[in-house]
């Protein structure tokens, strides 16, 4: 999914750069670098948020997920086959903690 998003953004950037280049000459003081191709690190971090790796679940948290999943027979069987985290997410959505 990330690859598709990056590909689309690169395609749009290429289209914008080629269309502005073919539209006419730029003034001498307006180089592409000053035109916004690059940005400061703090501005870039506001646009692209870094995701952190998920932390390990504690034994109490895992047991809590197991108790919720035990009430649903299909979820309980999936937990035995694929793991409690995959089963909980499939039936109840994202893990709440």
Curated annotation (Swiss-Prot):
Binding site for Ca(2+) 2: 67, 70
Domain of life (superkingdom): Eukaryota
Domain Gla residue range list: 53-93
Chief location: secreted
Single GO term (MF): hydroxyapatite binding
Cellular localisation: Secreted
Tissue expression notes: In the branchial arches, BGP is found outside the chondrocyte-containing zone. It is found in some cells in the basal zone of the branchial filaments, near the branchial arches, and within the extracellular matrix in the medial zone. In the vertebra, BGP is found in the mineralized bone matrix.
One of the record's GO cellular component terms: extracellular region
Membrane spanning residue stretches: none
Cystine connections: 69-75
Propeptide: 19-52
Modified residues (4-carboxyglutamate): 63, 67, 70, 77
Maturation and modification: Gamma-carboxyglutamate residues are formed by vitamin K dependent carboxylation by GGCX. These residues are essential for the binding of calcium.
InterPro entries linked to this entry: GLA-like_dom_SF, GLA_domain, Osteocalcin, Osteocalcin/MGP
Signal peptide: 1-18
Described function: The carboxylated form is one of the main organic components of the bone matrix, which constitutes 1-2% of the total bone protein. The carboxylated form binds strongly to apatite and calcium.
Annotated family: Belongs to the osteocalcin/matrix Gla protein family.
Protein name (database record): Osteocalcin
Gene symbol of the encoding locus: bglap
């Amino acid at each position: 999914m990330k690859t598709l998003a990056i590909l689309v953004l690169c395609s749009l950037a290429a289209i914008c750069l080629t269309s502005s280049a073919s539209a006419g000459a730029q003034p001498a003081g307006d180089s592409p670098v000053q035109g916004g191709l690059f940005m400061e690190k703090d501005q870039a971090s506001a646009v692209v948020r870094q995701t952190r790796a998920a932390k390990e679940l504690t034994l109490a948290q895992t047991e809590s997920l197991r108790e919720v999943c035990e009430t649903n027979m299909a979820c309980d069987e999936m937990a035995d086959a694929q793991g409690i985290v995959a089963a909980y997410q499939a039936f109840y959505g994202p893990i709440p903690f």
